[in-house]
Each structure stands twice: as structure tokens, then as C-alpha cells.
């Protein structure tokens, strides 16, 4: 499904919800912009470059503060006097009366002004509306156009730290789109402050355009060789799935500033993936699902595999492995010594195809035969639904010296149809760590393969099916730690996430075949599953965790022996931080994402005795905008349901009046391991609803979500939707009792998993608490979703048929008890298939249910962008909600035809 960890207010996220995944794939309101001066991977997705215009909404807010306005009707101020010769006594009485009335009015206004001021101050003090949103009550209302077009997006830079050829730390790769210095260069972080000499800088590409045989090319992405002598350049990139793309590839020589095709025999060939050897002497790449090798000392290209094609992938993932396992376009891994290449061979010949039909466009690029242009373009995707055959994956190795492909069998492994390979990490001396999951993702086998000797052994087994009945999370955060006897590390080892006392923590396994870790972290809090940074010289590990609160993220350090846990960020204040460390761990790009206006700076780490600090970004434009707009207050609090403490955020309109009654909109995602309630700065659709429409918006992260411990997270296994819906309903009941809430106007909405949860909540509640709902791209039956994701949380349909029946949206009578609900879906959704919505409509038809609306977006995928569709989604959500909260649907249902 599409995920999002919420990044600047995304409305939907992939079902593959892991915090280390890029959130920028398809974010409905994520409008991050990145300055080209500091960059990482090039973005080949141009979704957010689209300009979105605002739909006109009613000028007046139906819930403005009418109750504090003076009446202006038939009174003394407007009534004409009947006798112009009134005596002075009468006038004096009127004057005194007016003065008293005026004094009373003034006192009333001052009282409420002071009360509201005290309320705002209390919110700021208690809940940290140190959140920038909540600090302004006066100004212009937000516009939907401004929210959608990126005006409120924070500027955020990514630094691509690189290792110097001679081990220098603090080197970064920079791209300058304006080419004021050079298009692509490597320089020391100190050179930005003129603190270094020229030898610590390399100009890699002087210009962003380069010519080959008289044809000018523009880079889509660039990867310098480790020795900085060449640059691998992708041009003419065309997106495939969420992360993958194809392009023409070129080898750019730094000395001569000239380029040649990666494969001289096929310069126009579309390549899926290419990567440098650690020694900079070769490139391995995949084309047409076969693996090739180009050594730089020759123009010859060697074909390593020959079985690749429609059903077999070598070195790149198929759809489900890209979406649900690796979150990237690569399943190719060079050994550290450059002698071997490990790659995944994926055979999906037994995986059924699912057709995606395009009615308005032709993504295939193929012109139909004459007379057939009225038929849709059809793309068939190998998509394993729950219970269907999975692709069969095997780990293969290529021996560079002997030009041989082989595999290593480790006894006791899972059968072909019961095996997922989720992580491959090279160690030293030709050894590699491999994680294998069973199909239902509740048993992990970690094996250590000695590639030169072609042997392997089982080093760890994590059996969650027996331990707590939960699932194993897919991560790519295992970090190899090389031996250094002189520095207290006699053996190789690795850092990995482990479960300790019901929470995710870091463990250090040394030697690599040791199954008992050194515990690096512990306690009733959890670490973020992004790869930790390691300062090998000082045996220090840096990581991000939610130690202070589930809604916060801070950066910490700990020694490899598990001692001296220290915060790197200010934990005395609510904060949400991210960090990117230099290769040697001496510098860090610290990114503060909220609750105040985001900023970024590069600093030295505590082990680096050379003080350094440079502010990279302050988002001054956001600070200026905040002063001009009336933003909602965000009140963070907890709610306890069934003895489980859950995180809640309530967004109140800027001119909130506690004596009024406000409609309430619940927004949720709610997928396993996800998180929507956090302290990031965000001005999104929810902000617009509170600021401009004047409604309260509430989000609760229910059971099943992230950073609340495994007991509360894994309780949802086998019956997705039940506990999550219960938490939404119980929270809504609590809000319905609040004196400022209009309990007859409570709605819920979500996208993707949030769409499923919207329908499941409406079904389970049956109109008792919620009256309205809006579901976008929802799953309606988990048998329709992909196997790897679904079976992780639901087991297989064969093992859990009852759970699948219960989790499906099936009680149409219950849905009929709601006043009205809305369902929207893109017809070309390759993630959550349109089949889900069609199945729901069929059930509604058979039950004779009519209290719903449907909007379909032709040729739109899960993000719903095609042909202005994204704007239309939010226009429809907004106008539909206004109609609901002004009783438009109830009035419409009561209209009878004239006879």
C-alpha cells in the first residue's frame, strides 16, 4: 500500500511501514524541497512538481464564533426615537444603562480574552505547542492550494557522505545545479568554511551536461567510483515501480571529462541497476533481468546470467520484493574485497498475474494496431496475493576471478515455497550474513556463509511464533563491525535489532557466529530501525530512538560494551530528530524536524576534538508564513484503553472557543508498526480542516502501531482491524463527551491502510459514535492484498480462514447505520487493487445499501495523481466533509420526488 511514516503530513503510507523507508514515494502533502548543494540520491519521481490549484470553498465558516457577537436587531441602537423631546432624566437613565451595558460587555470580552489566552498559554506550556503549529491564532486561514502545492513544505537537505581514498573523514558529495563551482564535486566539510587546503576537494563533473558522439545528455543520477576517478551516470531515466527505474548508463572519466557507454555494444540499452566494485575497477549491472560485468580495463562486457527474462530476475527485485522487503531497486551486493558479487535470483514463474488497465494513457509506450486504439492498455504484473504462490528466491554468488556462478546450501533451511530472503550483509574474509524468514514471517534464520569455501552455518534462530506469537519485522539495519584487537575488538561482529523484554533494542553479536548479544540498549522504549552509525576508532555507536516519548525521536550514543548511553540532542525539550553521520563518525548532519520550525546543521560528534558547526537550513520562509497564517493548536495527550496507553493529538481551530460545539474529524493510518502521532512540524490537510473549515481533527495511534512495545503492537495479529477500530471508537466516545464537541457530527477518514481502517471502524461502530467516513484507496478484503505483507500480520488464509473473514469489510447492515460514507479509488492502483472497492460495491448492492458515494479516478495509481486527480481528491474530501457537517446529506436523504 503506499507508507508513510508521516513526513510533513502524508495522508497515506505504504503497508510496508518501516521508518527507514523513504516517505517521499507518494506523499499527498509531502512537499520537501532539496537544495542541490547538498544531496544524496537523485529523485526520478517528479510527482510533486505538479502545480495544484485551489477549489473555491464557501466563504463563511459555518462554525465561526457567532455566540460572542452582539445582537444587532431591533434594539435601542437601531430603533428610531418616538419623541425627540424626552426629558433629561430619561436620557440619564438611558445613558447610565448604556454605560452599564458597555461595561458588562467590556468585562465579558476581557474575561473571555483572558480565558482563551490562559488556555493557549496552558497548551503551549503543557503540550509543547512549542510546536510551531499552535503558536499563531491570528492571521489568514490556510488555503487548500497552499497545502497541496508545497508552500508549507520544509526545505530539507541530504548529505551524501563519502569515504576518502585515503580514509579521510568528513567528505561529502555535492551537486550544484547552477554550476557556480562545478556540477559534481567532493569536498571536505571544513572547506565550506575555508578551513582546508585544495587537496581535500575533487571536481568530478564540471558541467551537468555532457556529450557522447555529438549528443548532449543530462544526468538523472550519478554515482562516483570509490577512488573518485570515474562517475557512473544514469540518463533518460524512466520510472518503473515505486523505487525502480531504467536508464541508459555511461562511464564518465574525471580526468578527461568525457563519457562512454557502460556497454559499448548496446549504448541505448535500458539498464535496471548498476553498481561499482569497492575497488573502482568494475561495474556490475542488470539489463533485461540478466546480470552483466564491465571491467574498466576493457571494453568487453561479460554476461553473468542467461536465465533472466519475464519470470526470472537477477540482481533486481520483482514487484513484491521491491515493495515489501527491500524497499529499493537492488538485490546485488559486492563483497568488501571485490572478489565476489552476491545477488538474488527471483523466480516468479508460478506467481499469478494481475492485469492493470489504462483507459486514458498508454504507459507501455506501444502504439496499438490499427482499429484497436479504443481498447485499454493492459500491464500484467506478477502479484502474489495472500495464499497464492510466492516468488522463489535463492542467493547466488559470482566469483570474479573464476567467472563462475554458484550457490551455497545451508542445511535445515526453509523450503522454496516457505522462504523469504530479507537481508544480505557482507562481513570480512569473504563471509556474508543472510537473514531468511519463513513465509509467515515469524521465524528468522540468520546464517553465516563462507563464500570462498562454499560452506555455511546457522548462527541464530529467532522464533517469534513461540516467543510471543507476533511477527518479525523486515529491516535492513544490520551493521558489520570488523575486528580490531588493538582497539578492544578481538573478533568480527555485527549490530542488529533484537527484542528485549518486549521492546526493540540494539544488540552486538561478536564473534559473528555468537547467538548471544551484548545488550547495547534496554528499557521500556524502542530504537528506530535505521542503520546505526559506528565510530570504529572510538567504539561508539550512534542511533535514533523514542526513549523520551513514543512521539519523539532523539539521537543517542552508546559504547560497544553497552555502557555510557548519552543523548546527542537536547532531551529536555520535545523534539523529533534525524541524523546522518560521516563515514568515520566524526561529523553528523543533525536534522530537527519539529515541533518548531525545522532546521539542519552539521556538527562534530563528541569524539571529534575539532569543534565544527555549520547551519545548513533554517527554513526562514516557514517562519515568515507562520506569522501570516492562523494555524491550529496541536494538543498532545494520552488515552488509556484496555490498560494500554495510546498517543493522541488534537488539532483545534485557531480561534477555539470552549463554549462552542465543534464537529470532529478523525484521521488515521493505523497500519502495523506505523506512526501518525509525532512531534514533526506539519501543515497538511488536517491543518487545513482545522484552520479553515473550523473543525477539530483528532488522530490516535491505536494498538498495532509503532513504538508502543510488542505486546500492544502484535495483539492485532491474525485479526487486522478489530483492536485498531476499537481504539478509534473508544477515543471517539471520549471526545464525544467533551463539552466543546458536537457528538452528532463525528467523521473519520484515511488513505490506504487508513482507508481500510475507516471502513472497519464504521462497520464495527455501526453508527453509534461515528456518523460519517471517507475512505481512499482502501483494502476491503485482505485476501486481495500481497502475500508478503498480509501473511506477516494475518498468517496464510489456509491457516487463518476465520481471521480473514472477520477482517474483511463484510457487514453491510452495519455500514448502513451510518449517515453516509465516501469511497474513492484509482483504477490503475498496482498496490491496493481497484478490485477491493469493486468487491465492496458489489456487497453493498446485494445488501441494498445506498448511503454512500463513490468517486473513481481513471488511470491513477495508489497516489491518485493522473490528470489533476490529486487536487480533485482533496477538493472532494473537503466539500464532502462540509456537506456532512452541515447536515447536507441528511437533508438530501429526506427529499422526496414531487407527485
UniProtKB/Swiss-Prot annotation:
Q: Which organism is it from?
A: Talaromyces marneffei (strain ATCC 18224 / CBS 334.59 / QM 7333) (Penicillium marneffei)
> Looking at the keywords, is Protease present?
yes
**Family that this chain belongs to:** Belongs to the peptidase S9B family.
Q: What is this protein called?
A: Probable dipeptidyl-aminopeptidase B
One Pfam annotation reads DPPIV_N
Name the residue ranges with Basic and acidic residues bias: 61-74
Q: What is its EC number?
A: 3.4.14.5
Query: Where are the catalytic residues?
Result: 752, 829, 862
Record function comment: Type IV dipeptidyl-peptidase which removes N-terminal dipeptides sequentially from polypeptides having unsubstituted N-termini provided that the penultimate residue is proline.
Q: Where is it localised?
A: Vacuole membrane
Query: Enzyme group, top EC level?
Result: hydrolase
Q: Where is this region: Disordered?
A: 1-37, 51-84
What is the protein's membrane topology class? Single-pass type II membrane protein
UniProt-listed SUPFAM superfamilies: alpha/beta-Hydrolases, DPP6 N-terminal domain-like
Keywords, in A-Z order: Aminopeptidase, Glycoprotein, Hydrolase, Membrane, Protease, Serine protease, Signal-anchor, Transmembrane, Transmembrane helix, Vacuole
Q: Where is the composition biased (Low complexity)?
A: 22-37
An example Gene Ontology cellular component term from the record?
plasma membrane
Membrane-spanning residues where?
92-112
Task: Extract one GO BP annotation from the record.
Answer: proteolysis
Q: Which reaction does it catalyse?
A: Release of an N-terminal dipeptide, Xaa-Yaa-|-Zaa-, from a polypeptide, preferentially when Yaa is Pro, provided Zaa is neither Pro nor hydroxyproline
**Major site of localization recorded for this protein:** membrane
Amino acid at each position: 500500500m503506499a507508507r508513510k511514516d508521516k513526513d510533513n503530513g502524508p495522508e497515506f503510507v505504504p503497508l510496508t511501514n518501516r521508518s527507514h523507508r523513504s516517505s517521499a514515494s507518494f506523499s499527498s502533502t509531502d512537499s520537501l524541497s532539496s537544495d542541490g548543494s547538498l544531496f544524496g540520491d537523485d529523485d526520478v519521481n517528479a510527482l510533486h512538481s505538479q502545480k495544484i490549484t485551489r477549489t473555491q470553498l464557501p466563504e463563511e465558516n459555518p462554525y465561526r464564533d457567532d455566540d460572542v457577537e452582539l445582537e444587532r436587531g431591533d434594539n435601542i441602537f437601531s430603533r428610531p426615537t418616538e419623541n425627540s423631546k424626552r426629558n433629561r432624566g430619561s436620557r440619564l437613565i438611558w445613558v447610565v444603562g448604556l454605560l452599564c451595558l458597555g461595561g458588562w460587555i467590556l468585562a465579558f470580552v476581557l474575561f473571555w480574552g483572558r480565558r482563551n489566552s490562559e488556555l493557549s498559554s496552558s497548551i503551549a506550556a503543557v503540550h509543547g505547542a512549542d510546536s510551531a503549529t499552535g503558536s499563531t491564532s491570528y492571521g489568514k486561514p490556510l488555503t487548500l492550494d497552499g497545502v497541496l502545492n508545497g508552500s508549507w513544505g520544509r526545505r530539507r537537505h541530504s548529505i551524501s557522505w563519502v569515504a576518502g581514498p585515503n580514509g579521510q573523514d568528513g567528505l561529502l558529495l555535492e551537486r550544484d545545479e547552477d554550476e557556480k563551482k562545478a556540477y559534481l564535486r567532493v569536498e571536505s566539510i571544513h572547506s565550506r568554511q575555508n578551513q582546508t587546503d585544495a587537496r581535500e576537494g575533487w571536481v568530478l563533473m564540471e558541467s551537468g551536461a555532457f556529450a557522447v558522439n555529438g549528443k548532449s545528455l543530462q544526468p538523472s543520477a550519478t554515482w562516483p567510483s570509490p577512488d573518485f576517478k570515474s562517475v557512473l551516470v544514469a540518463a533518460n531515466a524512466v520510472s518503473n515501480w515505486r523505487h525502480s527505474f531504467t536508464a541508459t548508463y555511461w562511464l564518465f572519466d574525471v580526468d578527461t571529462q568525457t563519457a562512454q557507454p557502460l556497454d559499448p555494444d548496446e549504448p541505448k540499452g535500458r539498464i535496471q541497476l548498476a553498481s561499482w566494485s569497492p575497488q573502482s575497477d568494475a561495474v556490475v549491472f542488470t539489463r533485461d533481468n540478466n546480470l552483466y560485468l564491465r571491467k574498466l580495463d576493457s571494453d568487453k562486457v561479460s554476461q553473468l546470467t542467461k536465465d533472466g527474462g519475464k519470470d526470472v530476475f537477477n540482481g533486481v527485485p520483482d514487484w513484491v520484493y521491491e515493495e515489501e522487503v527491500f524497499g529499493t531497486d537492488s538485490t546485488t551486493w559486492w563483497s568488501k574485497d571485490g572478489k565476489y558479487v552476491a545477488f538474488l535470483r527471483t523466480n516468479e514463474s508460478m506467481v499469478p498475474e494481475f492485469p492493470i488497465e489504462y483507459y486514458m494513457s498508454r504507459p507501455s509506450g506501444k502504439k496499438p494496431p490499427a482499429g484497436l486504439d479504443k481498447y485499454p492498455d493492459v500491464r500484467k504484473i506478477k502479484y502474489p496475493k495472500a495464499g497464492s504462490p510466492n516468488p522463489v528466491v535463492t542467493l547466488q554468488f559470482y566469483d570474479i576471478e573464476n567467472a563462475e556462478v554458484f550457490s551455497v546450501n545451508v542445511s535445515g533451511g526453509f523450503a522454496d515455497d516457505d522462504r523469504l530472503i530479507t537481508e544480505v550483509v557482507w562481513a570480512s574474509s569473504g563471509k556474508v550474513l543472510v537473514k531468511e524468514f519463513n513465509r509467515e514471517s515469524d521465524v528468522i534464520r540468520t546464517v553465516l556463509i563462507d563464500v570462498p569455501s562454499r560452506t555455511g552455518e546457522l548462527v541464530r534462530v529467532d522464533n517469534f511464533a513461540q516467543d510471543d506469537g507476533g511477527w518479525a519485522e523486515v529491516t535492513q539495519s544490520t551493521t558489520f563491525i570488523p575486528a580490531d584487537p588493538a582497539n578492544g575488538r578481538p573478533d568480527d561482529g555485527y549490530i542488529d535489532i533484537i527484542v528485549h523484554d518486549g521492546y526493540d533494542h540494539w544488540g552486538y553479536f561478536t564473534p559473528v557466529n555468537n547467538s548471544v548479544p551484548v545488550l547495547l540498549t534496554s528499557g521500556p522504549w524502542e530504537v528506530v530501525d535505521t542503520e546505526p552509525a559506528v565510530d570504529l576508532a572510538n567504539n561508539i555507536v550512534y542511533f535514533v530512538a523514542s526513549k523520551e516519548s513514543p512521539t519523539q525521536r532523539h539521537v543517542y550514543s552508546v559504547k560497544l560494551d553497552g555502557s555510557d548511553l548519552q543523548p546527542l540532542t537536547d532531551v529536555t525539550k520535545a523534539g523529533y530528530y534525524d541524523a546522518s553521520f560521516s563515514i568515520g563518525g566524526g561529523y553528523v548532519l543533525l536534522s530537527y524536524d519539529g515541533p518548531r520550525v525545522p532546521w539542519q546543521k552539521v556538527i562534530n560528534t563528541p569524539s571529534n576534538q575539532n569543534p565544527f558547526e555549520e547551519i545548513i537550513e533554517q527554513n526562514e520562509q516557514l517562519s515568515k508564513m507562520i506569522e501570516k497564517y492562523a494555524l491550529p493548536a496541536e494538543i498532545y495527550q494520552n488515552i488509556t484503553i484496555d490498560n494500554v496507553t495510546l498517543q493522541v493529538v488534537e488539532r483545534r481551530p485557531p480561534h477555539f472557543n470552549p463554549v462552542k460545539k465543534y464537529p470532529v474529524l478523525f484521521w488515521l493510518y493505523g497500519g502495523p508498526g506505523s506512526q501518525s502521532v509525532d512531534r514533526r512540524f506539519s501543515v497538511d490537510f488536517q491543518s487545513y480542516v482545522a484552520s479553515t473549515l473550523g473543525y477539530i481533527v483528532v488522530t490516535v495511534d491505536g494498538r498495532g502501531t509503532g513504538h508502543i512495545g510488542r505486546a500492544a503492537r502484535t495483539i492485532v495479529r491474525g485479526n487486522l482491524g478489530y483492536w485498531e477500530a476499537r481504539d478509534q471508537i473508544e477515543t471517539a466516545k471520549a471526545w464525544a463527551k467533551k463539552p466543546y464537541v458536537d457528538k452528532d457530527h463525528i467523521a473519520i477518514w484515511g488513505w490506504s491502510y487508513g482507508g481500510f481502517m475507516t471502513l472497519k471502524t464504521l462497520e464495527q461502530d455501526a453508527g453509534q459514535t461515528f456518523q460519517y467516513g471517507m475512505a481512499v484507496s482502501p483494502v476491503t478484503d485482505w485476501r486481495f492484498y500481497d502475500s508478503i505483507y498480509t501473511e506477516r500480520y494475518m498468517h496464510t488464509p489456509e491457516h487463518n480462514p476465520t481471521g480473514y473473514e472477520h477482517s474483511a469489510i463484510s457487514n453491510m447492515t452495519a455500514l448502513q447505520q451510518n449517515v453516509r460514507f465516501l469511497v474513492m479509488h484509482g483504477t490503475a492502483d498496482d498496490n491496493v487493487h481497484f478490485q477491493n472497492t469493486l468487491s465492496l460495491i458489489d456487497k453493498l448492492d446485494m445488501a441494498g445499501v445506498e448511503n454512500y458515494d463513490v468517486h473513481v479516478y481513471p488511470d491513477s495509481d495508489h497516489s491518485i495523481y493522473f490528470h489533476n486527480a490529486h487536487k480533485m481528491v482533496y477538493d472532494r474530501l473537503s466539500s464532502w466533509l462540509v456537506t456532512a457537517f452541515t447536515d447536507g446529506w441528511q437533508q438530501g436523504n429526506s427529499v422526496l420526488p414531487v407527485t
